[in-house]
């Protein structure tokens, strides 16, 4: 059924991140790698919907999430995963689970800011401002000139707001509800991840 709940990405994302928010808001949060990586994988199609401007972000995000999905078969929680990398002295090495987690966290943050901007720009059919602001705030500080230039050019090929909602199989009212739900749920999760990196003195700007 084309209109079934399972066929609507925003609803699946909203439900998955609500569950993660409950975990990170608990007194002793332990986030399972399996649950986290599954929720993150549900976000992947959103990057594809944004077209060429976010092609690099999509490829990078999907690859990092896939690594965490594989890691989940043998590692229980995000804390255990980070501790293993710290013990192996490979945190900052390309391909490490912890490094990939930081990249995935930025992807989640970018989508959060994008949704905030889309909600705030209700009535505007262009996604250029929301996409530009979310990219500038989250990704641009970590990208070189060539990638930033390619993204800037790609902004002119973004789908319209109406086309995006059509791809996500939602009307304006429902999309706003589920986008706001993700914003509300992802905020404590992103804070939890930032604090996790900082508590282990790894930093978050690398």
Swiss-Prot record:
Q: What happens when the gene is disrupted?
A: Constitutive expression of defense-related genes that accompany the hypersensitive response normally triggered by avirulent pathogens. Induction of growth inhibition, premature leaf chlorosis and defense-related programmed cell death (PCD) at the early seedling stage, leading to a lethal phenotype before flowering. Large increase of cell death inducer phytoceramide.
- InterPro entries associated with the record: GLTP_sf, Glycolipid_transfer_prot_dom
Please verify whether the record's keywords include Nuclease. no
So what does mutating residue 103 to A actually do? Severe reduction in C1P transfer
Q: List this protein's GO terms for biological process.
A: cell death; defense response to bacterium; response to salicylic acid
Task: State the Gene Ontology terms under molecular function.
Answer: lipid binding; sphingomyelin transfer activity
Effect on the protein of changing residue 47 to Q = Decreased activity
Gene3D superfamilies, per this entry? Glycolipid transfer protein
Alphabetical GO CC annotations of the entry are: cytoplasm
Database matches in Pfam families: GLTP
**So what does mutating residue 60 to A actually do?**
Loss of 85% of activity
Instruction: Alphabetically list the UniProt keywords.
Output: Cytoplasm, Lipid transport, Lipid-binding, Transport
Q: Which PANTHER family match?
A: GLYCOLIPID TRANSFER PROTEIN DOMAIN-CONTAINING PROTEIN, GLYCOLIPID TRANSFER PROTEIN-RELATED
Q: What does the miscellaneous comment read?
A: The clustered Lys-64/Arg-99/Arg-103 residues form a positively charged triad ideally arranged for binding phosphate, explaining the inability to bind sugar headgroups and transfer glycoproteins.
Oligomer and partners:
Interacts with BPA1, PRA1F2 and PRA1F3.
Its protein name is Accelerated cell death 11
Name its species: Arabidopsis thaliana (Mouse-ear cress)
- Lineage start: Eukaryota, Viridiplantae, Streptophyta, Embryophyta, Tracheophyta
């Amino acid at each position: 059924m084309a209109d079934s709940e399972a066929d609507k990405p925003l609803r699946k994302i909203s439900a998955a991140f609500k569950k993660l928010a409950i975990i990170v808001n608990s007194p002793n949060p332990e986030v399972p790698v399996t649950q986290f990586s599954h929720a993150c994988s549900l976000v992947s199609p959103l990057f594809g919907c944004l077209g060429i401007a976010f092609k690099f972000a999509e490829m990078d995000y999907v690859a990092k999430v896939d690594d965490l999905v594989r890691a989940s078969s043998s590692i229980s929680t995000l804390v255990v995963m980070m501790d293993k990398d710290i013990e192996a002295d490979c945190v900052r090495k390309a391909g490490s689970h912890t490094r990939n987690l930081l990249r995935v966290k930025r992807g989640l943050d970018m989508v959060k800011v994008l949704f905030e901007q889309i909600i705030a720009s209700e009535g505007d059919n262009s996604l250029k401002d929301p996409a530009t602001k979310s990219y500038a705030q989250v990704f641009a500080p970590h990208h070189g000139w060539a990638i930033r230039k390619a993204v800037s050019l790609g902004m002119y090929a973004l789908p319209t707001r109406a086309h995006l909602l059509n791809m996500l199989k939602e009307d304006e009212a429902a999309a706003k509800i589920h986008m706001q739900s993700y914003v509300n749920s992802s905020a404590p999760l992103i804070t939890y991840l930032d604090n996790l990196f900082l508590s282990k003195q790894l930093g978050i700007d690398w």
